[in-house]
Amino acid sequence: KEAVNNINKKKKELQNTLLKGMPVLIKDITDVKGVRTTYGSKIFSNHIPLDSDLVVKTVESRGGVVLGKTNIPEFAAGSHTYNDLFGTTKNPWNLSLSAGGSSGGSAAALATGMAWFATGTDLGGSLRNPASWCGVVGLRPTPGLIPQGPSKTSFSNLSVNGPMARNVTDLSIFLDALVDHNNRDPLSYKKDVGSYHKNLNCYSDKFFSIGYTEDFGIFPCDKEVRDMTKNTVKLLENLGHNVNVEYPNMEAAEESFQILRAYLFYSAYDFLLDEDEKLIKEEVLWNIKKGQKLNVNKLKKADKIRNTIYQETLDFFDKYDFLIAPSSIVPPFNLNEPWVKKVENNIFNNYVSWLMIAGCVSLTSCPSIAISTSFSENGAPIGIQIIAPPHQEEKLLSFVKTIEDALNISNMIPKDIN
């Protein structure tokens, strides 16, 4: 009711904005002034922010009206959306399965038609994984394209905010609304292209050179996901693109990512160590304490590895226009499991390792769009991430639109919402 009242009060004013009063859902890790924002934690169950995040301010300045908050795992840690405050977000296509995370609430809300636009955040696939599992579209942009914060970790570019929508066309509109230059974000920069929406078809008649991988040569991967990736590659070849098995070397990616992620968690959430540990999810505590134990030599090594990966990824893009990989190594899993423990013959001893096919891409600062390309045996969507060189969101969106058009599944909706 409050959102509708806001729209009615500002009808004339909103008509001159980009979003014209369209409702927008905000992930519950992001502050909205005067709106309960819990971060998925009992500790913040009654938290009312005094100010909004830059993402929200940008949305509202472009005519978006905040409709509500979407569910997350506690402190957005993990790729399965559940917490002790609001319970578990179910996959709209199969209610016994996970919607992914940590932007699972946003993805599920979009899939069920609650809104056209929702925000997500992505550290290690938190936006991409749920998008592909719920049959929607999500973009992890080049760091700095969308201003965010202020936060304790404003100078880190590992976690970014990004748009989520039901299809690529809507995604391009929402990206236009989110992009801005704001000095409050030290990584923010002025984009050098026009409207992503107006230019959405500017590469639609082009043929591209594409590298692809099912596993980067190192990650385990479920057979259903491997088959889906192969079938997507066949589709791209039928569309006239040149596709080869080639990809940057990610052998050391997990070592770097785990260290940098732990440092980020300790920097952002060290204060939680003074709280009652019974109120904090085990995985969150593990990540914070891992960061607490880091020394400068480990951080130095992590940065060196990341720099090497970045340079080798740019070398890859000297030869190829895009890189394609699965957005997740498994289809959506059982709702009652906290995280994936085993794939093929690999056993994971922490909640991060199974996400590394997305996490390794985060290290590159490259934009990546997740899109569903098929359905698993249990009836839930599965899909790929399409990765472009830094700052090439326009080209990336245009290319992914051609894939979406060829697949012709973006207008499908889960039967459960009826």
Locate predicted features.
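Short gly/ser/thr-rich secondary-structure transition/capping motifs
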Residues: 6-9, 189-196, 303-311, 350-351
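General small-molecule cofactor/ligand-binding pocket signal
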Residues: 67, 242-247
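Short glycine/threonine-rich loop-to-helix capping motif typified by GTGT followed
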Residues: 223-225, 254-264, 334-340
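Hydrophobic alpha-helical segments in the ANL/AMP-binding
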Residues: 351-364
